[in-house]
């Protein structure tokens, strides 16, 4: 049986930007089954976001092909900060912040990769034990300052200034690759396109210290841009997090289901494990019947299931269907809070009140005249039910444990009224 050509699959999926030695890597893969590869992430926050999925999807594909992925948490480098892609110096974190973030990220990674044939390392294990003289004697002499200055990540910062702390980051990242290569048999590093200089610095260090025939490879991923030219990864509300407390499964699902027709096939290739045949079929459906949004629905299902599991996907679909159909009464209080987290909100008391007065007092309607007109025209829904009687009394304690009243005006304009 022919061996699965993972590099060819990655190329088809548009997942490769640059490779340091494709011929050497192909030869290694043909002759060995033990490739180990890693990517690093510094614990600058307490949650991963969908930008992290870009390199992690590559690791996951290698894992599914039988290879050994390693994620390196930068407990050491995270205390300094990677200058890549930044115009200004990072604010340094306390040791307590770094430790807290490490624990949160580790839990999220284990959820994505499981515990079989997967490893999480922390560069504080070796960088934290290194003193300044060891750093200068054992590694510093292998780095030429003129070469370091010419690296894109440094050159772009020279005009406004870069501290020695951030300037030395590429040496520390090179030491990481050398350490993992020598002590853990990790042969390849992957990263974003802005990491090319750091990755090649690591390969150079490995070859200088352990010989040019030592297997060491690098692969970078293209910058993910949307069809409109903007950077992928943000929603209208900001970053899309993997932590369900920061971005609920419903919001996460909505981010993917709302992708542009021009982007959806690219994202299916990159962020799902669907076969080429399935993706080509969905591409054809998008071209012929774009209004059905079959590709977007499948994309949202696959990525939500990968990140939040079957339960998170089911929750997101239940909320989506309830909001689309208007049957919000079927939702639980936590589901309501997920669904309408970013909707306009208002406050009211527990007192029963005439619908017209309620709409004006909560500022959903600008005047009693407008409120009466909208109610008579059937444009107002209370807790999912149309109310066209201007004498209708809203009883705030009747639904949702007396915590909320949900007003819908027209087809999709929801307001979450919190009962105090």
Swiss-Prot record:
SMART domains: S4. ATP binds at residue 234. GO terms for molecular function: ATP binding; RNA binding; tyrosine-tRNA ligase activity. Its main location: cytoplasm. Keywords: Aminoacyl-tRNA synthetase, ATP-binding, Cytoplasm, Ligase, Nucleotide-binding, Protein biosynthesis, RNA-binding. One of its GO terms (cellular component) is cytosol. Transmembrane segments: none annotated. GO terms for biological process: tyrosyl-tRNA aminoacylation. Pfam families: SYY_C-terminal, tRNA-synt_1b. InterPro entries: aa-tRNA-synth_I_CS, aa-tRNA-synth_Ic, Rossmann-like_a/b/a_fold, S4_RNA-bd, S4_RNA-bd_sf, SYY-like_C, Tyr-tRNA-ligase, Tyr-tRNA-ligase_bac-type. CDD domains: S4 (cd00165), TyrRS_core (cd00805). A motif ('KMSKS' region) lies at residues 231-235. A motif ('HIGH' region) lies at residues 43-52. Residues 353-419 form the S4 RNA-binding domain. L-tyrosine binds at residues 38, 169, 173. It comes from the Bacteria. It is found in: Cytoplasm. It catalyses: tRNA(Tyr) + L-tyrosine + ATP = L-tyrosyl-tRNA(Tyr) + AMP + diphosphate + H(+). Its EC number is 6.1.1.1. HAMAP family: Tyr_tRNA_synth_type1 (MF_02006). Homodimer. Catalyzes the attachment of tyrosine to tRNA(Tyr) in a two-step reaction: tyrosine is first activated by ATP to form Tyr-AMP and then transferred to the acceptor end of tRNA(Tyr). This is Tyrosine--tRNA ligase. The gene is tyrS.
């Amino acid at each position: 049986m022919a061996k699965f050509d993972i590099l060819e699959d990655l190329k088809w999926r548009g997942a490769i930007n640059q490779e340091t030695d494709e011929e050497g890597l192909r030869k290694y893969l043909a002759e060995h089954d033990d490739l180990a590869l890693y990517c690093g992430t510094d614990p600058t926050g307490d949650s991963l976001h969908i930008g992290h999925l870009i390199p992690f999807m590559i690791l996951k594909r290698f894992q599914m092909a039988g290879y050994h992925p390693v994620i390196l948490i930068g407990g050491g480098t995270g205390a300094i900060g990677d200058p890549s892609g930044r115009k200004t110096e990072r604010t340094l974190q306390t040791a307590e912040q770094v430790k807290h973030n490490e624990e949160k990220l580790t839990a999220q990674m284990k959820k994505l990769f499981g515990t079989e044939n997967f490893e999480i390392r922390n560069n504080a294990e070796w960088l934290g034990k290194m003193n300044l003289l060891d750093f200068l004697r054992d590694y510093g002499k292998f780095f030429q300052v003129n070469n370091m200055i010419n690296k894109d990540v440094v050159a772009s910062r020279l005009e406004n200034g870069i501290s020695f702390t951030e300037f030395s980051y590429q040496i520390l990242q090179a030491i990481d690759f050398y350490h993992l290569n020598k002590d853990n048999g990790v042969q390849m590093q992957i990263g974003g396109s802005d990491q090319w200089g750091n990755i090649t610095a690591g390969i150079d260090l490995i070859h200088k210290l352990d010989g040019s025939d030592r297997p060491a490879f690098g692969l970078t991923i293209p910058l993910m841009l949307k069809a409109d030219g903007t950077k992928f990864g943000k929603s209208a509300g900001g970053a899309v997090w993997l932590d369900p407390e920061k971005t609920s499964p419903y919001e996460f699902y909505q981010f993917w289901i709302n992708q542009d027709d021009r982007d959806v096939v690219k994202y299916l290739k990159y962020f799902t494990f669907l076969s080429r045949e399935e993706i080509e079929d969905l591409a054809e459906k998008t071209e012929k019947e774009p209004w059905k949004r079959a590709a977007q629905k499948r994309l949202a299902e696959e990525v939500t299931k990968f990140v939040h599991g079957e339960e998170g996907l089911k929750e997101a679909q239940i909320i989506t269907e309830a909001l689309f159909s208007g049957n919000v009464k079927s939702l639980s209080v936590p589901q309501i809070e997920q669904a309408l987290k970013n909707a306009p909100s208002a406050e009211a008391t527990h007192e029963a009140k005439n619908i017209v007065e309620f709409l004006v007092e909560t500022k959903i309607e600008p005047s009693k005249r407008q409120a009466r007109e909208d109610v008579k025209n059937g444009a107002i829904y209370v807790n999912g039910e149309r109310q066209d009687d201007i004498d209708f009394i809203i009883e705030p304690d009747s639904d949702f444990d007396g915590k909320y009243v949900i007003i819908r005006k027209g087809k999709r304009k929801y307001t979450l009224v919190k009962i105090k």
